[in-house]
Amino acid sequence: MYLDNISAENRAKVNHQYRINSLNFLHTLRKDELLKENGSEFQLHFDESENSFRDSISAVKNGVDIKNLGQGEKVLLGVENAYSHLKETVKILLIEEPENHLSFQNLQKLVNMLSSNTGVQVFIGTHSNMIASRLGVDNLHFLDNGQISKLEGLNRDTIRFFQKSTNQNLLNFTLGKKIILVEGNAEYILMEKFFEMIHSKKPEDLNVSIISVDGLSFERYLEIAACFVDKKVVVITDNDSDYVGNVQSKYSSYQQFQNIKVSSDLDNDNQTFEICIYKNNKALLDSSGLTKSKDLQGYMLREKAEFALRLLEHLETDNISKKFIIPNYIKEAIEWIIKD
């Protein structure tokens, strides 16, 4: 910061003045007999070099020395300083994982800072969903085993979606090799347990990631999946009483991709995840005591996440998992995702 804010001429003047002041200070100590060297052949000496001066100065923010600031504040200060004092000779700026030690709000400040036009080529290495999405998915380059890949030909609306969306799953999705996409909290809460019941292993043990997205966002993720032939993605979705319109026709453009599958119940009467669960396990669930409500299916539809949590607890603590029937469309999706 010091070197970026001082001219060469003034820098020389500062160095000269620092040497004079150092010598005068040492002379004063001896004159006032505050420093007694007792006739030793060695005498105390100040290091009046520029490095010594630079080591002795610091910066202050709101009255607090930067040495006492948190690591997050130091990251912001470092990036801000780098951006504010780019010289004409600088052509490339490299920033490695600037998100380290940052709170959510400071990460937002960082994203706004990085979005500014610097006039130079900026490379940012990151594992942050927010940085990757807010700076534009079309600007991303993925490094994997020495190979570089880029998302080409994305719809402009898809780019804007990830820049503005509150959902921060972009890197989780793009870096995963086998992805199960589900609609909401209820499906997300139960899907890992269903996977474990089918494969006797947790998803992460088989390199599978489960990501919850808004059902209206599936196509945004599938557009990215279509760019990666080595990434398997299965969507588990409701038919909402119209399998042909809401599933078959809606996702017909992705049928050509061998790495993409959309799975839903074919029966229009089984319009939601909760109804499929209930119809496959009516007697078991009615006798489970999961709720005092006499209308269990109605409760499942009203309190989706709460019911999912209660069911998960029963599946993990009781023996009902051996009797529990996972709907076929979910079972098929979970089996498909690990096939080579």
Question: Where would I find each of the regions flagged by the language model?
Answer:
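Extended helical coiled-coil dimerization/tether regions that scaffold
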Residues: M1-L69, K74, N81-T89
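Short N-terminal helix-initiation segments at or just after the protein's N-terminus
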Residues: L3-D4, K36-G39, K67, H85, ...
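Generic amphipathic alpha-helical segments used as scaffolds and interaction surfaces in large
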Residues: E9-I20, H101, V122, S212, ...
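Catalytic cores of large soluble enzymes that bind and process phosphate-bearing ligands
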Residues: V14-Q17, N21, Q71, E99-L102, ...
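Generic solvent-exposed, charged/amphipathic alpha-helical segments
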Residues: L26-K31, V111, E192-E196
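Residue-level recognition of the N-termini of beta-strands and the immediately preceding loop/turn
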Residues: S40-F42, K91, E204-V208
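Switch/communication elements of ASCE P-loop NTPase nucleotide-binding domains
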Residues: F53-L171, Y188-E192, E335-K339
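Acidic, divalent-metal-binding catalytic cores of TOPRIM
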Residues: A132, V137, H141-D340
